[in-house]
UniProtKB/Swiss-Prot annotation:
Residues noted as binding ATP in the record, renumbered to the chain: 30-33, 51, 87-91, 415, 479-481, 495
Function: Together with its co-chaperonin GroES, plays an essential role in assisting protein folding. The GroEL-GroES system forms a nano-cage that allows encapsulation of the non-native substrate proteins and provides a physical environment optimized to promote and accelerate protein folding.
Protein name, per record: Chaperonin GroEL
Family to which the UniProt record says this protein belongs: Belongs to the chaperonin (HSP60) family.
Keywords: ATP-binding, Chaperone, Cytoplasm, Isomerase, Nucleotide-binding
Broad class of enzyme this protein falls into: isomerase
Biological process according to GO: protein refolding
Organism: Acinetobacter baumannii (strain ACICU)
Length: 547
């Protein structure tokens, strides 16, 4: 076991605060409409330019191990806020730094750190209740556009794109952000259910110009196994052929004799058919087949439940208005499933999302909800250079998360105003003792920090603006982008209540723990002796004269 370096009391806390300040000072330059960029060196490729707080925080690792512990604890604040709300990471870091720096003065003056923490917790609870009570619902196009624009650093085109995407696919729909190929941003919307499996054979394509198979009002056969014997399919094929409608087969795989026969029948025009592999693997494949079944009104033919493909009838098949199958994707538009059954399935998947502990699983489940309930929208980012594209993608990701948070819990006045107004809710609030009341006052002062930083980044005088905002009422605040005062909601400067709330809760949680730290322990790096130099090889003796 390696030797440990141990620090106590003020010497431990001063090191920790030094680390916190390095990280927070690097992150907070990005706050607000006039926040600056941070350039991050990469060991490969071009440097990364970003205005995203959590990206900056994740890059910081300090040489001094005690300082690094402080930095990593504050990094946890921005990461947690990012996980819960998807935005507000810079605000959370600024708040954590302010609470810690205010609190440490009281600890140094001899107050009880545990009571200070309790006081901070009481104040946070009151402020969070206040934020929830003043939040206004954000369910219209304009509010969503404004939230998206503010979060994307006052970029109105991004706000418009996100609002359009939400309008098209609904609040449950999946919106993804990808790097585009041109200079302009673009929005691609796929209505209906899309999954990433194309036709098994290109001979199923009936549109030669686009190499796709388009099926109008088709029957849909879902099979939870490989099909290689054509005899299993004959009864279904004959029944479908009599109706004159096309058929889409989704199975684990279609191969051998079965595939050859389907291709021949399709090319001769006897029956219009297309075969596709089922999406996903293992249990996820079974679940997705069931989703498609509910969406289209089909029954999954599975031997696990005692069903045989040979006995399948038209009643077991689903239908849809239109299906387009390309080499890589299948899109089912307007499935004929029962609306109540679809809603029930969506509810069921949502319950699984709540219970899931894996980020990957949650993402996949969310995609399934979107495919059943709405659709999928892809925002394609356009930029002149790769560096600019990455920076813009960071901003659009933030904006997307912010709009989702706004839809969830509503919006409050932006620009740090909601937190400054929450000071009124702390008036007259007292703790069980003087130290707890001091903790409440620590938070009262600290929650002004985001507005102070926004103003400082805009090049104005923070104390003048803070006093002016405090003298106002309601949503009256300061627009750092234009240097004007006015109603923040009318000026379109909104913050999602969830983002503001999460930032404060996580900042206070970690700052409170750091205030109550009395001892820090870290490994002492071992000095490994340098490898000794290899000695030179001895010279070879001269050879004696030959006889």
């Amino acid at each position: 076991m390696s030797a440990k370096d141990v620090k106590f009391g003020d010497s431990a806390r001063s090191k920790m605060i030094a680390g916190v300040n390095v990280l927070a000072d690097a992150v907070k330059v990005t706050l607000g409409p006039k926040g600056r960029n941070v350039v991050i060196d990469r060991s490969f490729g071009a440097p990364h330019i970003t205005k995203d707080g959590v990206t900056v925080a994740k890059e910081i690792s300090l040489k001094d191990k005690f300082e690094n512990m402080g930095a990593q604890l504050v990094r946890e604040v921005s990461s947690k806020t990012n996980d819960i709300a998807g935005d507000g990471t810079t605000t959370a870091t600024v708040l954590a730094q302010a609470i810690l720096n205010e609190g440490i003065k009281s600890v140094t003056a001899g107050m009880n750190p545990m009571d200070l923490k309790r006081g901070i917790d009481i104040a946070v609870k009151t402020v969070v209740e206040n934020i929830r009570s003043i939040a206004k619902p954000a369910d219209d196009f304009k509010a969503i556009e404004q939230v998206g624009s503010i979060s994307a650093n006052s970029d109105t085109t991004v706000g418009k794109l996100i609002a359009q995407a939400m309008e098209k696919v609904g609040k449950e729909g999946v919106i993804t952000v990808e790097e585009g190929s041109g200079f302009e941003d673009a929005l691609d919307v796929v209505e209906g259910m899309q999954f990433d499996r194309g036709y098994i054979s290109p001979y199923f394509a009936n549109k030669q110009d686009t190499l796709t198979a388009e099926l109008e009002n088709p029957f849909i056969l879902l099979v939870d196994k490989k099909i290689s014997n054509i005899r299993e399919l004959i009864s279904v094929l004959e029944a479908v052929a009599k109706t004159g409608k096309p058929l889409l087969i989704i199975a684990e795989d279609v191969e051998g004799e079965a595939l050859a026969t389907l291709v021949v029948n399709n090319m001769r025009g006897i029956i219009k058919v297309c075969a596709v592999k089922a999406p996903g693997f293992g249990d996820r494949r079974k679940a997705m087949l069931q989703d498609i079944a509910i969406l289209t009104g089909a029954t999954v033919i599975s031997e696990e439940v005692g069903m045989s493909l040979e006995q399948a009838t038209l009643q077991d098949l689903g239908t849809a208005h239109k299906i387009t199958v390309s080499k890589e994707n299948t899109v089912i538009v307007d499935g004929a499933g029962d609306a109540a059954a679809i809603a029930e399935r969506v509810q069921q998947i949502r319950a699984q999302i709540e219970e899931s502990t894996s980020e990957y699983d949650r993402e996949k489940l969310q995609e399934r909800v979107a495919k059943l309930a709405g659709g999928v929208a892809v925002i394609k980012i356009g930029a002149a250079t790769e560096v600019e594209m990455k920076e813009k993608k960071d901003r659009v990701d933030d904006a997307l998360h912010a709009t989702r948070a706004a839809v969830e819990e509503g919006v409050v006045a932006g620009g740090g105003v909601a937190l400054v107004r929450a000071v009124n809710a702390l008036e007259g609030l007292k703790g069980a003792n003087e130290d707890q009341t001091a903790g409440i006052n620590i938070l009262r002062r600290a929650i002004e920090a985001p507005l102070r930083q926004i103003v400082a980044n805009a090049g104005d005088e923070p104390s003048v603006v803070i006093n002016a905002v405090k003298n106002g009422e309601g949503n009256f605040g300061y627009n750092a982008a234009t240097g004007e005062y006015g109603d923040m909601l009318e000026m379109g400067i909104l913050d999602p209540a969830k983002v503001t709330r999460s930032a404060l809760e996580h900042a206070a949680s970690v700052a409170g723990l750091m205030l109550t730290t009395e001892c820090m322990i870290t490994d002492i790096p071992e000095d490994k002796p340098a490898a000794p130099d290899m000695g030179g090889m001895g010279g070879m003796g001269g050879m004696g004269g030959m006889m």
